[in-house]
Regions:
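Short, low-complexity disordered leader/linker segments with a strong preference
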Residues: 1-33, 340-344
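N-terminal secretory/targeting leader peptides
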Residues: 27-121, 129-132, 136-344
């Protein structure tokens, strides 16, 4: 009996040790190298999340699928990478939803000024039916969206003056994304809006080609804009998501098992990235102050004036994304705000 027990125990132990590898071997997974481009540097929240995604893909595929992370816009700005994905010259990327508006107008929904009051609202809408509906417009254009990551609430920096009231924006040369909603929004607010790719931004600030820019705290910190900007105004004027994209040409050639590896890794990376981004954002303002930036918060009354001024822009967004989608989003937000529980 003792010998039988030992044999049984050894069999169970051996099965446990080899179950996971055998499960991977049983899947339809081939050796693949995935070029994954992103715009920020490797020490940014974006870079950290790409690294985690790469680790997860390798783990879930039993080492067969490997991600080559290529940051700092080395493969070009978002728009260039999107075209590379559409043409099948690059496999994956993560970038701003705002730069997709020229490909699918529904993405402009996320550019609506003051759309979300909190990260909780953003998560609920982006990860729910509305976020999926917007993402589902991509395959017809040659792209597949996996998940939304968090870039964060955007805030203003400039080298001229503190922005304490709406009129302080008058005449400031403000870099905006290459996106008509951002262009029209800041023109409407009185700024001289200048569209530029992110990869050219630091140099443009340094040479005074532009006076200022708007980005989340994390990006302001990791991109060292404090070296070329003096004033930071907390406005939270737009919540910016990032989106993890795959070339549809390449995606369609993957097995279901390979697609599942990428999707599962993307979901894991989303949870990590949002937590990491929010924790860093909580520390970033203090760090930016320590770096010498003068920080002020836009008064609520002035934020309300901005909202009123942007009414026309919001109406045009509704028309461009489709009124059914616009109304569905507003109704979903109203339900979230009426529900009991935390609002943050």
């Amino acid at each position: 009996m003792t010998t039988m027990r030992r044999t049984l125990a050894l069999s169970i132990l051996t099965g446990a040790l080899f179950a996971a590898p055998l499960a991977v071997l049983a899947q339809d997974i081939k050796p693949r190298l995935i070029r994954f481009g992103y715009g920020l540097n490797e020490v940014s929240n974006q870079g950290r999340a790409v690294k985690l995604f790469a680790t997860e893909v390798e783990r879930l595929s039993g080492g067969k699928m490997k991600v080559r992370a290529i940051g700092a816009a080395a493969l070009g700005p978002d728009v260039q990478m999107q075209q590379a994905l559409i043409g099948g010259a690059q496999e994956m990327m993560v970038g701003s939803t705002a730069t997709l508006v020229g490909i699918t107008p529904q993405m402009a929904l996320w550019d609506t000024p003051f759309l979300f009051n909190s990260a909780r609202e953003a998560d609920a809408i982006l990860d729910g039916p509305i976020g999926q509906k917007v993402m589902d417009t991509l395959p017809a254009k040659g792209l597949v969206g996996l998940v939304y990551w968090e870039n964060g609430f955007r805030n203003l920096t400039n080298s001229k003056r503190a922005v304490n009231k709406l009129e302080d924006l008058d005449g400031i040369k403000l870099r905006v994304m290459q996106n008509n909603v951002f262009l029209e929004s800041f023109k409407t607010l009185g700024a001289n809006a200048v569209p530029l790719p992110f990869s050219e931004l630091f140099s443009a600030l340094e040479t005074k080609t532009v006076d200022g820019q708007e980005n989340p705290f994390n990006t302001i910190l990791s991109s060292k804009f404090f070296e070329v900007q003096k004033f930071l105004t907390v406005t939270n004027h737009v919540y910016s998501p990032w989106i993890v994209l795959v070339s549809k040409k390449w995606w369609d050639g993957l097995s279901k098992d390979e697609q599942k590896v990428l999707m599962d890794a993307a979901v894991t990376s989303r949870e990590f990235e949002r937590k990491d981004t929010r924790e860093e954002a909580g520390r970033a303002v203090a760090e930016l102050k320590a770096k010498g930036m003068q920080v002020n918060e836009l008064p609520a009354a002035e934020a309300a004036r901005m909202r009123d001024r942007l009414t026309r822009v919001n109406a045009s967004i509704g028309a461009n994304v489709g009124m059914d989608l616009w109304n569905e989003t507003q109704a979903a937000l109203a339900r979230l705000r009426a529900a009991p529980g935390p609002k943050k």
